[in-house]
């Protein structure tokens, strides 16, 4: 199967089309400069507790307050808050690996037991703002790489269900155990099956470094919260991270800044594939050139063709 990623950039929107053997199979659109993306991490301030909803509204700097439900605090919220408190001005601060973890959140508790108005909390955007609604948040923080997802405040190693080989499971668990500090766990993704030991080790260490930079940003921004602590990569790079494999033959981009961004990202995760990133300079719009526009239009026609009839 031959895969291509076609990226169209306009001043207001980024459109990303994934094609398999020239057939459009996935289309993603992302608004430019919205300021909030899924995966972004913030130091927010609790604005209002809603006991009836068992939820709270949190100010993260958006025009609309963000929403967090009790179940989205995550089991390790007390440990997370202990870390946030240690990073406040005048406090010495400490690392996750040196912490004694707090008892987990009860599954049937009340949000008022853990949050109060004015409290600073570390949160991650789980769902972007839609219409009049602000972003949806989680305090169950995780950092995704190509091969792994880092999960602080646990020592568990989880494997993708698609990894079935006993030998491969043993290899991946061995790699994780050798690299992970105390109180850090990982979810090992399907992509790790094709990865070398050193690539997985590097991915884990990269996510640990990102986490440490995020924690350092708490101390820097505690006096001026709400503040962004860590920004997730753009949507194009996220798709590449999650789906890049040997079947990709081309990534075509019609914007030079985005081209350089994607090329730089691939150089980090899979240098030998950097050459498949192409800057499109044609006079015809990129989606027209690759027959994307026509396929999108046909999806909204009265009759839609399906594979195998």
Task: Describe every region a protein language model picked out.
Residues 1-309:
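DE-rich acidic low-complexity regions and acidic surface loops
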């Amino acid at each position: 199967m031959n895969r291509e990623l076609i990226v169209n950039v306009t001043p207001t929107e980024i459109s990303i089309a994934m094609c398999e053997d020239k057939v459009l199979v996935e289309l993603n659109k992302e608004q430019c400069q919205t300021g909030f993306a899924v995966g972004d991490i913030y130091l927010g301030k609790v604005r209002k507790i809603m006991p009836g909803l068992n939820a709270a509204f949190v100010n993260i700097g958006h025009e609309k307050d963000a929403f967090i439900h009790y179940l989205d605090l995550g089991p390790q919220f007390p440990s997370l808050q202990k870390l946030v408190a240690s990073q406040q001005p005048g406090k010495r601060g400490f690392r996750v690996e040196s912490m004694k973890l707090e008892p987990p959140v009860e599954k049937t508790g009340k949000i008022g037991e853990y949050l109060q108005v004015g409290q600073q909390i570390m949160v991650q955007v789980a769902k972007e703002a839609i219409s009049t609604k602000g972003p949806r948040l989680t305090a169950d923080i995780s950092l995704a790489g190509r091969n792994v997802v880092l999960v602080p405040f646990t020592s568990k190693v989880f494997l993708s269900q698609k990894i079935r080989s006993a030998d491969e499971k043993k290899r991946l668990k061995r790699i994780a155990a050798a690299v992970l500090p105390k109180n850090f766990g990982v979810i090992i993704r399907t992509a790790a099956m094709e990865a070398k030991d050193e690539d997985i080790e590097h991915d884990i260490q990269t996510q640990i470094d990102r986490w440490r930079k995020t924690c350092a940003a708490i101390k820097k921004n505690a006096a001026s919260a709400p503040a962004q602590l860590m920004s997730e990569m753009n949507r194009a790079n996220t798709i590449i991270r999650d789906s890049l494999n040997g079947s990709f033959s081309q990534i075509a981009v019609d914007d030079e800044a985005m081209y350089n961004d994607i090329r730089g990202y691939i150089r980090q995760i899979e240098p030998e594939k950097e050459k498949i990133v192409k800057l499109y300079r044609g006079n015809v719009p990129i989606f027209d050139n690759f027959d994307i526009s026509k396929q999108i239009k046909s999806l909204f026609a009265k009759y839609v063709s399906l594979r195998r009839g």
